[in-house]
């Protein structure tokens, strides 16, 4: 099977969701692919790739609220029965990077 490697870059302005479906479709169309496997990798630790439906905007609201509840900006709750709140120990890269690394 033929393989092609390419780099797609996306500029962001901080926390949020970016729909890259059209970018991927254009990449596939530009390269005249009929079939194959598309493997996506993020080279930045503060980024995640997810697959979600895009019909209901409340899905992204729910996902954002859920992520903020399990990995908040300033501290997190332990998974023990006591649910102790613990501050992050790594902070050198700024408040927005602390939860992003978890």
Whereabouts are the PLM-identified features?
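Active-site histidine-anchored catalytic micro-motif
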Residues: 1-102
